[in-house]
Curated annotation (Swiss-Prot), chain B:
GO terms for biological process: gibberellic acid mediated signaling pathway; photomorphogenesis; regulation of growth; regulation of timing of transition from vegetative to reproductive phase. It comes from Arabidopsis thaliana. Induction: Not induced by exogenous gibberellin. This is Transcription factor PRE2. Atypical and probable non DNA-binding bHLH transcription factor that integrates multiple signaling pathways to regulate cell elongation and plant development. Regulates light responses by binding and inhibiting the activity of the bHLH transcription factor HFR1, a critical regulator of light signaling and shade avoidance. May have a regulatory role in various aspects of gibberellin-dependent growth and development. Expressed in roots, leaves, stems and flowers.
Length: 160, 94
């Protein structure tokens, strides 16, 4: 079947979009957790890391991408602290989707590598291989943009 | 809701051509700084690209971890009267 050559777009927003979302996230953290709160340092690190990923997902388009949607959903579940139950649910979902995916298998060596990739990309478990690659290309662009933003922030704050 | 999305993906993926797969693989290749040009068959290079992608994502996650660590330390120790704090404040409020 001839396919319509749809343009697969993997463009990501500019760096300042990521920076803005991240700074807003950080300032929200500040409001919720004043500096002299009894939070342990490791909890603070975890909150900042989570803010980084959530703001990245929002900057990248929120619900318009499968990976960002999955990331935001996971973050929301974490907040409700029902993690254990939802993890068990997700495992069942992966089993079902891998049965469906078998109809669209590429070469085994490719599928094997794709399986490892599925564990790294948010929401990858339910994606067919070609969709997975599209989402991955977008994801790694956004991730590297987010890392650049964080590096800039660290550099800026480190100057004496 | 997720099952309907999966069935939608299964039907739309049959329309994705091999050309588009090749295109996606080359896009992935371009996004990864370390990967070198591979003259071997498409299948072998596709698996290598995916492997390198996994490594790249793991590295980015590690970098994000380290930077979160550093950022936490810096934000905790920031002097509210320093120029850095003023810059942050203006960026957040502006």
């Amino acid at each position: 079947m001839a396919s319509a050559d749809k343009l697969i777009n993997t463009d990501v927003p500019e760096k300042d979009v990521f920076a803005l979302h991240f700074l807003r996230s950080l300032s929200n953290l500040r409001t919720q957790n004043p500096l002299n709160s009894p939070d342990k340092s490791i909890d603070r690190v975890r909150k900042i890391k989570k803010a980084a990923y959530v703001s990245m997902a929002r900057a990248a388009g929120g619900n318009s991408r499968l990976w960002s949607r999955a990331l935001l959903r996971r973050a929301a579940k974490d907040d409700n602290k029902s993690v254990r139950f939802s993890r068990r649910k997700r495992k069942v979902t992966w089993k079902i989707s891998s049965k469906r995916r078998r109809s669209n298998q590429r070469a085994p060596v490719v599928e094997e590598a794709a399986e490892r990739l599925r564990n790294l990309v948010p929401g990858g478990g339910g994606m067919e291989t070609s969709k997975l690659m599209e989402e991955t290309a977008h994801y790694i662009k956004c991730l590297s943009m987010q890392v650049k933003v964080m590096q800039c922030l660290v550099d800026g704050l480190s100057q004496k | 809701m997720s099952s309907s999305r999966r069935s939608r993906q299964a039907s739309s993926s049959s329309r994705i051509s091999d050309d588009q797969i090749t295109d996606l693989i080359s896009k992935l290749r371009q996004s990864i700084p370390e990967i070198r040009q591979n003259r071997r068959s498409n299948t072998v290079s596709a698996s290598k690209v995916l492997q390198e992608t996994c490594n790249y994502i793991r590295n980015l996650n590690k970098e994000a971890d380290d930077l979160s660590d550093r950022l936490t330390q810096l934000l905790e120790s920031i002097d509210p009267n320093s120029p850095q704090a003023a810059v942050i404040r203006s960026l957040i409020n502006g």
